[in-house]
């Protein structure tokens, strides 16, 4: 494979395009297609990250502030069915370099147990406004954080934003998963909510036209 071919391959496959939003209340009737995720970060610096993730599809774990990543894995290790290793670059304008490949789940489980900074969350899939959304409900030190993401194969413009989204977090590095692994939301939630109350919610104006959906 030539250098030009590798560059073309990276351009086609190795980027993610997403917008992210804070959720404070996620309706129970929308909590469909759950996936338990535990992931550990072995490098996280200025937007660059190296991550190992293990997950169990169809598992709706009841996560709370006491749900540490290792205790959750101890309870559900036998249900882990998929694992990946991922390299990420800094996010700019809702676009981020991301290269990912599959791992043997048993090897990945041992890696998560043996090092890195781990976090746990349950991911739900929601269809809203013509887009598929992922809604992550965090446990452990990041409880009670909930983040909704809309990802497309190209820039996420002219978005219909669900009613459960409170304010946009796109490109706010504090809310990147690698930042949350090292500086969990539970330690600064009060300060952030005070900041949000002072500044008010926002939607980015540089991604085309935003529309608000009515509650489902």
Spans of model-derived segments:
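Phosphate-end processing signature that detects enzymes handling 5′-triphosphorylated RNA
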Residues: 2-216
